[in-house]
UniProtKB/Swiss-Prot annotation:
Protein name: Transcription factor bHLH27
Biased composition (Polar residues): 49-58
Domain of life per record: Eukaryota
Cellular component terms per the entry's GO annotation: nucleus
Domain bHLH, first and last residues per copy: 50-99
CDD domains: bHLH_AtFIT_like
Localization, UniProt: Nucleus
Amino acid sequence: MEDLDHEYKNYWETTMFFQNQELEFDSWPMEEAFSGSGESSSPDGAATSPASSKNVVSERNRRQKLNQRLFALRSVVPNISKLDKASVIKDSIDYMQELIDQEKTLEAEIRELESRSTLLENPVRDYDCNFAETHLQDFSDNNDMRSKKFKQMDYSTRVQHYPIEVLEMKVTWMGEKTVVVCITCSKKRETMVQLCKVLESLNLNILTTNFSSFTSRLSTTLFLQVTLSLSPSLISLFGNVITSTNYKILNASREYCTCLVLV
């Protein structure tokens, strides 16, 4: 019975000791602050009180700065799981790692875009220099052969002649010296050029010329200045120069109008 009382007494004293130590550890800044504010009875108290109060103030300032930085960090990080210090720091580290990964991804995309733009500006050749020189030499040889072939060709085969297909030709006298010639022909390649050459070859005094182009026809109206002595041979002159096709001359009027229609 005495042993049990002794052990219970020791247990009680040990528990009280740890409780007292915890209270002293938690309340030492306040005790030092209060002890520094008053006068000390010991001769060393005057020297230790200002130092203790200075330490308390510096510790308070340090914790205040730390809390301010944590608040600023909490406002920057978008995802905060908890509001304690450890969670804020952990979430900040995770967010920084996420930003680093995004930076690497963007840099890779930028490099890929730059490489594509370089390929578009300067395309890469799949053959070496020797193959390129050989290819260029063959190309130049082929061009020389083609030019020789073109030189050997006859001029008549290169410049084709497109005859004028006259559909209707009408000659009308307007007075004694003025004649109106209306020519209607089918519209083909170089028809207008050939017709102009024909008119120039006649060596007639042309006052005015009017060309009208349609989908499949080309109409030309000429105002000529001629003499009456030329009137019998005017139609035959046009017929022989324009084309070698046989025409049938229809006299609508003996003195004023003569029509030439293609047979």
